[in-house]
């Protein structure tokens, strides 16, 4: 019983210390599909997404998701990603960038910029279901530390406003802000550029039939039915 309770507490702590896992993966996947086609061929989107949840899932890191502690982790894993990419080790480059993205994007989350926030509200804020819409940008990031520091600006006010209004536009805005930083960091890390062509896979409703095929199927069934009747009658006549 004690072990089960401990496991439950660990899972709860992890969820309270970052955007939920689908959001982390959605952000890094969005980056991938907005890089140029050459870079997409080199990188592994599955490993990017896996890396994006490793700080929670594998490291069980529940203390370095906010600035300034998020900066060293982001820098370490970005450097590892860049080094691996330059060595043409594209799988580790993908994984490491995914890890870096986790620390970067969490820095933008309002609950990570306040203290003693109610756990229930923290979880609700970061469980927002949203597909980020920020567009790819190739601005040069000169100072990651400064960029992450700026990411914290206005976040306490965001939190207070959200607590009072539960306005979903606030966490959505912060996810887009984090994506706006991820784009240029990915471009610099992988010596890439923004993709002018859209290659992202979208879910398209699929019909297993159309009008013509349905009519054809009905005709076939009708012919088979008539054929069966004819054969039965033929057998009776022989008898």
Describe the residue ranges of each PLM region.
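Intrinsically disordered, low-complexity sequence elements enriched in Ser/Thr/Gly/Pro
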Residues: 1-2, 229
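Sec-dependent signal peptide recognition
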Residues: 2-11
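N-terminal, motif-rich segments that launch catalysis or mediate targeting to/interaction with membranes
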Residues: 12-95, 113-207, 218-222
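Selective detector of the "anchor" transmembrane alpha-helix that sits immediately C-terminal
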Residues: 207-231
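Short alpha-helix carrying the canonical HExxH Zn2+-binding catalytic motif
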Residues: 93-101, 105
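Cytoplasmic C-terminal tails of single-pass
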Residues: 234-239
């Amino acid at each position: 019983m004690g072990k089960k309770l401990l496991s439950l507490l660990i899972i709860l702590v992890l969820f309270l210390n970052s955007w939920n896992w689908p959001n982390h993966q959605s952000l890094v996947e969005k980056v991938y599909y907005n890089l140029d086609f050459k870079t997409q061929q080199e990188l592994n989107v599955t490993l990017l997404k896996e890396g994006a949840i490793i700080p929670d899932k594998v490291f069980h890191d529940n203390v370095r998701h906010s600035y300034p502690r998020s900066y060293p982790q982001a820098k370490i894993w970005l450097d590892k990603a860049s080094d691996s990419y330059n060595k043409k080790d594209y799988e580790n480059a993908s994984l490491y960038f995914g890890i870096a993205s986790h620390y970067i994007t969490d820095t933008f989350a309002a609950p990570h910029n306040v203290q003693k926030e109610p756990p229930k509200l923290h979880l609700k804020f970061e469980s927002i279901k949203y597909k980020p819409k920020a567009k790819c940008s190739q601005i040069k990031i000169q100072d990651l530390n400064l960029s992450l520091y700026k990411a914290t600006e206005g976040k306490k006010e965001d939190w207070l406003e959200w607590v009072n209004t539960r306005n979903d536009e606030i966490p959505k805005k912060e996810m887009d802000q984090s994506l706006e930083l991820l784009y240029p960091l990915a471009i610099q890390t992988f010596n890439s550029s923004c993709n002018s062509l859209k290659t992202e896979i979208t879910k398209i409703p699929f019909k297993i039939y159309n009008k013509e095929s349905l009519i054809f199927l009905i005709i076939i069934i009708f012919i088979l039915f008539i054929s069966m009747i004819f054969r039965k009658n033929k057998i009776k006549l022989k008898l």
